[in-house]
């Protein structure tokens, strides 16, 4: 939850924690990102976060920017676009049509995503505009 104080939660646990793994870290708040850094710096517990850097509109998620700004290290998981180049953007499709607008987070919708390079992102957006 957005109002959860992760640092306090970890401090109140009875058992010893070896490592904290955070999936979908893009959904963390900026405050929670800094709480995780406090866990690393003051409690000496390693934290590993996994998540998307940017949304389908190429904007940072609320947690992505702060996390990338203060992370001790960043390891990118590489994916490949259909053209063979490095995929850097998660393209949203609804009913087979590339989307460049809409809500950042959609739950339970009929959307799908595909990893594409910047060139193919522009190509899909242009094709989508021509279909209108």
Q: Model-derived features: where do they sit?
A:
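Inter-Walker segment of RecA-like/P-loop motor cores
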Residues: 1-18
């Amino acid at each position: 939850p957005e109002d959860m104080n992760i640092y306090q939660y970890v401090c109140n646990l009875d058992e010893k924690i070896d490592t904290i793994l955070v999936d979908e870290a893009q959904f963390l708040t900026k405050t929670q990102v800094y709480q995780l850094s406090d866990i690393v710096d003051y409690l000496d517990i390693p934290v590993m976060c996994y998540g998307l850097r940017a949304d389908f509109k190429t904007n940072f998620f609320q947690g992505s920017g702060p996390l990338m700004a203060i992370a001790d290290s960043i390891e990118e998981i590489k994916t490949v676009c259909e053209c063979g180049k490095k995929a850097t953007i998660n393209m949203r499709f609804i009913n087979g049509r590339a989307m460049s607008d809409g809500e950042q987070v959609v739950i339970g919708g009929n959307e799908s995503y595909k990893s594409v390079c910047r060139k193919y992102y522009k190509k899909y957006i242009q094709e989508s505009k021509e279909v209108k």
